[in-house]
Amino acid sequence: MARYLVLAVALLLAACSSTQKKPLADDPFYAPVYPEAPPTKIAATGSIYQDSQASSLYSDIRAHKVGDIITIVLKESTQAKKSAGNQIKKGSDMSLDPIFAGGSNISVGGVPIDLRYKDSMNTKRESDADQSNSLDGSISANVMQVLNNGSLVIRGEKWISINNGDEFIRVTGLVRSQDIKPDNTIDSTRMANARIQYSGTGTFADAQKVGWLSQFFMSDWWPF
């Protein structure tokens, strides 16, 4: 019996344990892509000026090729509210009048046969859920790929070390070149297939985690 109890406890601990890996600051998935350096051309006239390295005061500075940097303005705000309720009523009423036979009531042991039964049930349940989140800030990302239609696949991360922990923001998504503003910024609400992650690691982040025993009581494994 003790052997089965130890096995059951081990299974519960294994189920409650978290296998999620901690994020790393040098994740290769978010590594920047650098544009290839153009071949150096020697001017035939001996002049220092070269057309390949020239830029105009009126040129477009918006990101449009692999390796360019674009600033994403985070303007995320979500709010969800849900309420549900149900009420179930059920009742039954049954009666059996005394049975007459031969001009008198039929009785058992001198007690007339008479039955009265009444039952009722009323169940009412209500639930409310309200959740809201907001995220403001900015992060610069790298253009990882340019699609055939001109859309840009962008990806980037920002790590900030504060006291005993690190905070990070990771962004990946798809943007249209037309939605990029003249100052080379774009709102996060204009990103398609956006993945925005804001979290942290260290002492403060660990303090916000729920312990394994509390996770068990709040999980589907708890029978009550």
Curated annotation (Swiss-Prot):
Lipid sites, type S-diacylglycerol cysteine: 16
GO terms assigned for molecular function: cytoskeletal motor activity
Gene Ontology CC annotations of this record: bacterial-type flagellum basal body, distal rod, L ring; cell outer membrane
Pfam families: FlgH
Subcellular location: Cell outer membrane; Bacterial flagellum basal body
Secretion signal, residue range per the UniProt entry: 1-15
Superkingdom of the source species: Bacteria
PROSITE patterns: PROKAR_LIPOPROTEIN
GO BP terms, alphabetized: bacterial-type flagellum-dependent cell motility
Membrane topology: Lipid-anchor
Location, primary (coarse class): membrane
Residue numbers with lipid attached (N-palmitoyl cysteine): 16
Keywords: Bacterial flagellum, Cell outer membrane, Lipoprotein, Membrane, Palmitate, Signal
InterPro entries according to UniProt: Flag_Lring
Biological function: Assembles around the rod to form the L-ring and probably protects the motor/basal body from shearing forces during rotation.
PANTHER family (alphabetical): FLAGELLAR L-RING PROTEIN
Record family assignment: Belongs to the FlgH family.
HAMAP family: FlgH (MF_00415)
Binding partners and assembly: The basal body constitutes a major portion of the flagellar organelle and consists of four rings (L,P,S, and M) mounted on a central rod.
UniProt-recorded name of the protein: Flagellar L-ring protein
Source species of the chain: Shewanella baltica (strain OS185)
Organism lineage string: Bacteria, Pseudomonadati, Pseudomonadota, Gammaproteobacteria, Alteromonadales
Gene designation: flgH
